[in-house]
């Protein structure tokens, strides 16, 4: 099957299932089971319940999908530092 035939949807992760699978509520209202794409596994991108994601699906099986992108959260005040990381100190140049 060619990549041009895949359909993309956006949704919200509602539940984390075993074996790197997720239950996703699509914006259209349908609920599907999606697995993590290989590039997300390789780059160790973690997905939690409540994250907005983009799903790729085959038009032949609309019950399963591949999670290809996790959208950045829009929480205010984000500094970009990992959670739990100590604050960085100021350095003076000589």
Curated annotation (Swiss-Prot):
Domain of life: Bacteria
Alphabetized GO MF terms: ribosome binding; rRNA binding; translation initiation factor activity
SUPFAM superfamilies in alphabetical order: Nucleic acid-binding proteins
Compartments it resides in: Cytoplasm
Biased composition (Low complexity): 82-94
Predominant cellular place of this UniProt entry's protein: cytoplasm
Domain named S1-like: residues: 1-72
Region feature (Disordered): 71-94
Pfam family, one: eIF-1a
InterPro entries: NA-bd_OB-fold (IPR012340), RNA-binding_domain_S1_IF1 (IPR006196), TIF_IF1 (IPR004368)
Keywords: Cytoplasm, Initiation factor, Protein biosynthesis, RNA-binding, rRNA-binding
One GO location term (cellular component): cytosol
Transmembrane segments annotated in the record for this chain: none
Assembly description: Component of the 30S ribosomal translation pre-initiation complex which assembles on the 30S ribosome in the order IF-2 and IF-3, IF-1 and N-formylmethionyl-tRNA(fMet); mRNA recruitment can occur at any time during PIC assembly.
Xref: PANTHER family: TRANSLATION INITIATION FACTOR IF-1, CHLOROPLASTIC
Entry similarity comment: Belongs to the IF-1 family.
Stated role: One of the essential components for the initiation of protein synthesis. Stabilizes the binding of IF-2 and IF-3 on the 30S subunit to which N-formylmethionyl-tRNA(fMet) subsequently binds. Helps modulate mRNA selection, yielding the 30S pre-initiation complex (PIC). Upon addition of the 50S ribosomal subunit IF-1, IF-2 and IF-3 are released leaving the mature 70S translation initiation complex.
Protein name: Translation initiation factor IF-1
Organism this protein belongs to: Rhodopseudomonas palustris (strain BisB5)
């Amino acid at each position: 099957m060619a990549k041009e035939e895949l359909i993309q949807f956006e949704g919200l992760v509602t539940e984390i299932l075993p074996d790197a699978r997720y239950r996703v509520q699509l914006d259209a209202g349908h609920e599907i089971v999606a697995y993590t794409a290989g590039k997300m596994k390789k780059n160790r991108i973690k997905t939690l319940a409540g994250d907005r994601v983009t799903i790729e699906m085959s038009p032949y099986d609309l019950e399963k999908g591949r999670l290809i992108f996790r959208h950045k959260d829009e929480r205010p005040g984000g500094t970009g530092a990992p959670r739990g990381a100590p604050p960085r100190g100021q350095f003076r140049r000589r």
